[in-house]
Swiss-Prot record:
Domain of life per record: Bacteria
Binding locations of ATP: K593
One MF annotation (Gene Ontology) recorded for this entry: zinc ion binding
UniProt domain comment: IleRS has two distinct active sites: one for aminoacylation and one for editing. The misactivated valine is translocated from the active site to the editing site, which sterically excludes the correctly activated isoleucine. The single editing site contains two valyl binding pockets, one specific for each substrate (Val-AMP or Val-tRNA(Ile)).
Protein name, UniProt field: Isoleucine--tRNA ligase 2
The enzyme's E.C. designation: 6.1.1.5
Gene: ileS2
Subunit architecture: Monomer.
Organism: Bacillus thuringiensis subsp. konkukian (strain 97-27)
Cell compartments where the protein resides: Cytoplasm
Classification via SUPFAM superfamilies: Anticodon-binding domain of a subclass of class I aminoacyl-tRNA synthetases, Nucleotidylyl transferase, ValRS/IleRS/LeuRS editing domain
Family per record: Belongs to the class-I aminoacyl-tRNA synthetase family. IleS type 2 subfamily.
Matches recorded under Gene3D superfamilies: HUPs, Isoleucyl-tRNA Synthetase, Domain 1
UniProt cofactor(s): Zn(2+)
Gene Ontology process terms (BP): isoleucyl-tRNA aminoacylation
Length: 1033
């Protein structure tokens, strides 16, 4: 075995292992070795390569890698195809910035062809950084053969899906109100909108709509979007709701009966009550009368009107509200647009022409006030949608869009979701399920340039549509020869003209591109260019056994995958979804570069190593929980887990090499109870870890492994050190080597999916083979000893209590104590005699015994809990307190046992006192200190005799010299001669404990003499000792 370089950094180790993986094609071998095995399928959600990775990506890549590595080691064939999301607005916005242009007008002036070429060039800006990040974090995924959404084969598969949907009559062109981004100048789908809500404060207004031909009667309407008022064409009431006419300060106002108090507040008189249906068709004067409204400005009925807020009357602007649009269509009222595609008022509103509407709420309200039409204004906090790409506030905007009739197969969506296992499970019928319940038709078209072109050609003369499902299909119907290398992007596909099968006229492609979420949702099919090729491979890789991405993908990729698959095949595309929580900063705030609280995962790997970062992300909390995260989190993972394991491994290699131990040779071995215990712990942990990983409970699995590594380091190795330090090779020492070797090899396999680099380093050095080509450990039932584990757990509890006891009373473990008494509070069959020596050695005590009668070593003190007893006992409270103080210890003991006692007050009244009224404190016998955990109480004799004090000094001296040896980098097996120069009293103490010193310090000759200032000095408290070490002669 190679010597472990303890000075090698984690990054150095990981760089070395990566090189070895690449040179020996270990990733490729891990897949090839499972050829013919059952497939386990996972899909890689495609990131965009025009932005850099963040800590959330580190979590996602870690989880996916853990799953893929574990399933591979568990015997499955796991293909891991990378992917790139390369279309959409982020790319366009980046290119606009690069070119110094802004908006669709300037893009078209620049030229669509050069613009889309620039987009294509820019999509892989950070591909090198993504590849380096992916490899450095240890995520094994095939980046040499990824699916890329901009490539023709991928787009052709998307066209086949869209063409099939069109064939089914589910793709249609409609005029409707959709969420619209005025900055990007395109509409968005409902699932895109769901990703961008923000809590904002907007100016709201309660507006007076004067009843026509009345002097002082007004409908009151409330709106949080005053900018829409110039487009008003109607007021809506609920036909079955009650409304009142109420007089206030000379005016009569009409509002919902349920809302009158909240709206008018005070000083009003209700004149009459009317059903909403009685108000229908009442005409009013609009705040902004428009000549274009030839049929409108009257009250209509609508079921969506409620009395939950506002006035119970809804101002209707059909161009800017979905409900508004529908009700106006059904009523046959006028339609009025007052806003252009940039979100600015048109000449229809002259005094605000050219202004962005969301900036005009104050202007609108001022105008209303000036005209006497403003009843009330206030800031209103509400959730408002923003563009998930550019962060601009959205408008609801009427226009033509291409939509997929997802509502027609809503039941399929819901049924498919019912078959999926969600982590966390509440997502299934909660956030995701509710979104499906309330879904609307998918707005699939985008009035942009860089994206998959919508493959629909429309006839110039009739209503016929043609939706080619392949390039060959398009060529077959085109009126002129199409290039062999036709690129399926704008403007190239726009130049292809088709002849109408119905009337023979020319057909042109509709100019839109599609929603990028449809691109990524098509990946199960398009990644293999299905159905044009790879049919068998696709069928083997569909559906996914698991997908894992951030929770923000609930209404993104998780939805688009489900939707595309349901629309195309009717089938569900995945069996399990791991919805990962946000990685937050230390204060629980979302990380962002603008706030300056974002952590760069590349920097974290560079400082602490990928294993530490991965472990920190896994062990802290379940991956679907939001987690607070910082550099300190990663540092703790490194020091507590990775470094601890490396220390155990280096300890083993150091001593095994010194003793020339060869695990491949056969030795006579005699296992101790400690060996049997650690092997049982190893296999019981293996059992728990496999169960947890099979249920995707990564954190539970990681914590089980962490506990095992801690016990191996801080219990097994520490308790076995003397065996490793012995000279020669005997049966017990050989058993220690054999046991620790088996433990380390198995742990390296257990952690391989979690921390792949350190796992590889250990396994490769101990066995000569890659851990990632091994099978995952299975439980050896014959090595499980539950009773032994329970007994050792009890020992560990007692030792921990003893250490805590010493800490509380400032008694160093190096200071021997006379006695430890263990009080057991629950009867059990624990054989403490078998563990006597371990407990005494660990806690450095001279005697140990178990006592069932705790009254010999403890007593109870009772104090009245005045907070509870005061109200209960009233005037008797002080008398009860005095009575408690004078109880004998037997009476106190009886009270604690029975949990009640009766005090007879001076008045003769019997007062029942229970343990709920009293604070019960257990007090140790004089000269003892106690610590308890409910099951056990550890009593330590704190009287330190002179003899014990001197031994404590000797043990402290041993610790100091051992540290000194480390500083000198002396070989651990080097026997030394020691010369000491110190005061006479310490000389005598050390002489009295010469054997103890020689045994623990590998000292051959131990002498006292005069040393010069050039020699080194050790500190033992306030005492100084000069020391000189040399190799023993």
């Amino acid at each position: 075995m190679k010597k472990v370089d303890v000075k090698e950094s984690a990054v150095g180790r990981e760089t070395r292992i990566r090189k070895q993986w690449n040179e020996q094609s270990i990733f490729e071998q891990s897949i090839q070795n499972r050829e013919g095995a059952q497939s386990f399928v996972f899909y890689e959600g495609p990131p965009t390569a025009n932005g850099l990775p963040h800590v959330g990506h580190a979590l996602g890549r870690t989880i996916k890698d853990v799953v893929a590595r574990y399933k591979t080691m568990a015997g499955y064939k796991v293909l891991r195809k990378a992917g790139w999301d390369t279309h959409g607005l982020p790319v366009e916005l980046g290119v606009e910035k690069q070119l110094g242009i802004s908006g669709k007008h300037e893009i078209e002036e620049y030229g669509i062809e050069p613009f889309t070429k620039k987009c294509k060039e820019s999509v892989f800006t950070y591909e090198k950084q993504w590849r380096e990040f992916t490899e450095s974090i240890g995520y094994w995924v095939d980046m040499d053969d990824p699916y890329v959404t901009l490539e023709n084969p991928y787009i052709e598969s998307v066209w086949h899906i869209l063409g099939t949907i069109h064939e089914k009559g589910l793709l249609y062109k409609g005029h409707r109100v959709s969420p619209y981004c005025p900055s990007c100048q395109t509409s968005l789908s409902s699932h895109e909108v769901a990703q961008g809500y923000k809590t904002v404060k907007d100016l709201s207004a309660t507006v007076k709509f004067k009843v026509k031909d009345s002097e002082n009667e007004y409908f009151l309407g409330w709106t949080t979007t005053p900018w829409t008022l110039p487009a008003n064409v109607a007021l809506a009431v609920h036909p079955n709701m009650e409304y009142v006419k109420a007089k206030q300060e000379g005016h009569v106002y009409i509002v919902a009966k349920e809302r009158v108090q909240d709206v008018l507040k005070e000083n009003y008189e209700v004149l009459s009550v009317h059903k909403g249906e009685e108000l229908l068709n009442t005409s009013y004067t609009a705040p902004f009368p428009m000549k274009e409204v030839t049929n409108g400005y009257r009250v209509i009925g609508a079921d969506f009107v409620t009395a939950d807020s506002g006035t119970g009357l809804v101002h209707i602007a059909p161009a800017y509200g979905e409900d508004d649009y529908r009700v106006v269509q059904s009523e046959g009222l006028s339609f009025l647009h007052v806003v252009d595609e940039k979100g600015e008022y048109t000449e229809v509103v002259p005094f605000l022409k050219g202004k962005f509407v969301k900036d005009c709420d104050v202007d609108i309200v001022r105008y209303l006030a000036k005209e006497g039409l403003l009843y009330h204004k206030e800031k209103y906090e509400h959730s408002y949608p923003h563009c998930w790409r550019c962060d601009s506030p959205l408008l609801y905007y009427a226009g033509e869009s291409w939509l997929i009739r997802t509502t027609a197969i809503k039941d399929t969506f819901l049924q498919n979701n019912d078959t999926v296992t969600w982590y966390p499970d509440h997502m299934k019928h909660g956030r995701f399920g509710k979104f499906l319940e309330n879904m609307v038709d998918w707005n699939i078209s985008r009035n942009r340039y860089w994206g998959t072109p919508l493959n629909v050609w429309e006839c110039e003369s009739c209503d016929h549509q043609f939706a080619p499902k392949s390039i060959a299909d398009l060529r077959k119907h085109s009126t002129k020869e199409t290039p062999e290398d036709l690129e399926l992007h704008k403007p190239y596909v726009d130049e292809v003209q088709v002849s109408c099968e119905k009337c023979g006229s020319a057909m042109n492609r509709t100019p839109e591109v599609i929603d990028v979420w449809f691109d990524s949702g098509s990946m199960p099919f398009a990644q293999y260019h299905y159905p044009f090729e790879n049919k068998e491979l696709f069928e083997e890789q569909f559906p996914a056994d698991v997908i894992a991405e951030g929770i923000d993908q609930t209404r993104g990729w998780f939805y688009s995958l489900l939707a595309v698959s349901a629309l195309y095949t009717g089938k569900v595309p995945y069996k399990r979804v791991l919805s990962l929580g946000h990685v937050l900063d230390e204060e629980g705030q979302k990380m962002s570069k603008s706030k300056g609280n974002a952590l760069d995962p590349v920097d974290l790997v560079g400082k602490f190593g990928a294993d530490a970062l991965r472990w920190a992300l896994l062990v802290d909390s379940a991956p679907w929980n939001a987690k607070r995260f910082s550099e300190r989190t990663v540092l703790e993972a490194k020091s507590k887990f990775v470094d601890t394991l490396v220390n155990v491994y280096s300890f083993y290699v150091l001593y095994a090499n010194l003793d020339e131990y060869n695990p491949n040779e056969t030795y006579d071995v005699k296992r101790t109870k400690l060996d049997e215990w650690v092997l049982s712990r190893l296999h019981s942990t293996t059992k728990k870890v496999r169960t947890a990983l099979d249920d995707y409970q990564f954190t539970n699995a990681a914590r089980e492994i962490a506990a095992l590594v801690d016990e191996v380091s801080n219990w097994y190795v520490r308790r076995s050190r003397n065996r490793f330090w012995e000279s020669g090779m005997n049966a017990e020492k050989a058993a220690a080597y054999e046991t620790l070797h088996d433990v380390l090899v198995t742990i390296s396999k257990l952690i391989a999916p979690f921390t792949p680099f350190v796992a590889e380093d250990i396994h490769l050095n101990l066995t000569g083979s890659s851990v990632h080509l091994e099978d995952y450990p299975v439980v050896n039932e014959s090595l499980l000893q539950p009773k032994l584990e329970a007994e050792m757990d009890a020992v560990l509890q007692v030792v921990e209590l003893g250490r805590s006891n010493r800490n509380q009373h400032s008694l160093k473990v190096k200071q021997p104590l006379a006695e430890l008494v263990l009080l057991e509070h629950n009867e059990n069959d624990m054989d403490w005699e078998s563990y006597r020596d371990i407990v005494m050695d660990e806690l450095n005590v001279k005697a140990f015994h178990v006592e069932l009668d705790e009254t010999k070593y403890t007593s109870y003190q009772l104090k009245l809990n005045f907070k509870k007893a005061g109200p209960k006992f009233g005037k008797n409270v002080n008398a009860v307190n005095g009575w408690l103080k004078q109880l004998s210890q037997d009476e106190v003991q009886n009270f604690v046992s029975t949990e009640r006692a009766v005090y007879e007050a001076a008045s003769g009244e019997e007062v029942v006192v229970t343990t709920e009224d009293v604070l019960v404190e257990k007090v140790a016998k004089s000269g003892f200190s106690n610590t308890t955990n409910g099951q056990y109480t550890v009593m330590l004799d704190t009287n330190v005799t002179e003899e014990l004090l001197q031994e404590g000094v000797a043990r402290e001296f041993i610790r100091a010299v051992q540290e000194y040896r480390k500083q000198l980098n002396l070989p651990v097996n080097l026997r030394v001669d020691v010369i000491l120069d110190t005061e006479e009293e310490l000389q005598q103490t050390l002489t009295n404990h010469k054997e103890l010193l020689e045994e623990n310090l590998l000292v051959k000759q131990f002498t006292f003499g005069h040393l010069t200032n050039e020699d080194d000095e050790l500190s033992l408290g306030e005492t100084k000792v000069r020391i000189k070490l040399s190799a023993a002669q």
